[in-house]
Amino acid sequence: METFKKIYKRASERKGGAKALEILLGQKIIGKKLHTDNAALQSVTALSDDRVLSAFTKQVFKSGFVWRVVEKKWSDFEESFFKFNIEKILMMPEEMLERKAADPKIIRNYNKVKTIKANAQMMFDYSLEHNTRFAQFIADWPSSNIIGLWAYLKKHGQRLGGNTGPYALRLLGKDTFILSSDVEAYLRSQKIIDGGLQSKKSLTAIQTYFNQLQQESGYTLTQLSRLIAFANGDNYIQINVVQVNDQADIKTNGAS
């Protein structure tokens, strides 16, 4: 298996140098110093549970659909579903869900609309049993076993398996890697996995490898996931960092 330094060197060469790479990894240049600006480092603790349900729902609707359409319609989703207030969602009768699923202002997919109430119920039940917000539950879960949180969401939620749950967690600011096609291809090329991507054996091996890289580097799982993707596959787009009046000006170059 490759070390962090080897992966970093290759990604840096492909992306136009270390400073450019750090920006792509989720950091920005202020003056001559690199400052962290990564969503994975933001606290999930401050979030209310309606924001968690909103993120779950957004990723459910993005799955297998055009993301920009979901983003364009999202304000209508927020309005239609009471800004994802858990108690109000749980009070919605089936007939109301059916009517809202037929509203052209949102994406008309009844099976996905039903997940809103189902996932609200999951969150409510957990909060009731443990006397804590679901957002706090997510915040407290150790990223060194992030696959365990994935498994929880898959088991207890609806349509939160695969990459849907991980993308929602990242949207919320929870540190997690994403098993994109580039990351999967890399893991297979390094013989870290050889079976099904979502099998318990594969996920355990992947978590172990990411934990090892994190111990070597101090980078977040989010950054490491991006780093592996940048170091592999066909994404050779580079950025040039030009220092102007202590600000970082970024220009994009295509590279073959």
Task: Label each residue range with its predicted role.
Residues 1-37, 131, 135, 139-256:
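C-terminal accessory module of base-excision DNA glycosylases/AP lyases that mediates lesion recognition
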Residues 58, 118-121, 125, 185, ...:
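Generic alpha-helical structural context detector
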